Each structure stands twice: as C-alpha cells, then as structure tokens.
C-alpha cells in the first residue's frame, strides 16, 4: 500500500489552510494500492484536443507540484479554455478557504460563455 510522502501532503493543504485543518484532513488519508495511485496520477490515454469543441474553465494552482502549471497552460491553449491561476493555495482547492473565490468565478464565466 502507498501513502503520499509528507511534501505531497503539505502541497495539498498549503496556502490559507490552517495547521489544524491540514492535520484533520491528513488524518483522513488512507493507503492506496500502487495501481490505484498510478491510475489516478498518470495520463493513461491520449486525447486529441483538436476535437475538443466546448467552452472550458480551468482553475490551476501556481505552486502545485502534483499538476505542473506548464501542463495546465498547454491544455488551456490547446482547447481554447479560460484559465484562472490561483495563488496561496494548495492542490486541494476544495479544502482551502479560497474555494469561495473559485465558486464566485464560475457563475459569471458560465453566463458570459453561454450568452455568446
């Protein structure tokens, strides 16, 4: 079984998450099989992005060691997505206090995108 190393856990709960919250969420982590980790963290199939024809809004974290910003920018460019770079947060965006900021940006984007 595999557990994420401490630096990956720290990256998940970095930024504005309090030490107490980070510890609480860390205590909920459970060991995974190496196969499950591989499937969850590697792109196992290729997608021809030339055929993606839908509006997309991508949220990325500037200092995310799990999903490098360079790759996120490349995806956004390839599919013509709007990209929002988040500061002072870790990979676990839904667990961070910035989540309210993220959700506040979705509705205006949807309205602007669907009325074009």
Where are these regions (language model features)?
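Alpha/beta-hydrolase
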Residues: 1-54
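Generic structural signal for individual residues within well-ordered alpha-helical segments
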Residues: 23-26, 73, 103
């Amino acid at each position: 079984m595999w557990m994420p190393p401490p630096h990956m856990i720290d990256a998940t709960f970095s930024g504005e998450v309090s030490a107490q919250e980070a510890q609480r969420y860390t205590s909920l982590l459970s060991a995974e099989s190496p196969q499950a980790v591989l499937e969850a963290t590697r792109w196992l199939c290729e997608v021809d992005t030339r055929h993606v024809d839908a509006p997309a809004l991508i949220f990325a974290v500037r200092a995310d060691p799990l999903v490098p910003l360079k790759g996120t920018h490349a995806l956004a460019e390839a599919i013509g997505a709007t990209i929002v770079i988040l500061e002072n947060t870790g990979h676990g965006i839904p667990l961070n206090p910035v989540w309210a900021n993220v959700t506040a940006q979705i509705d205006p984007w949807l309205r602007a995108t669907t009325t074009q």
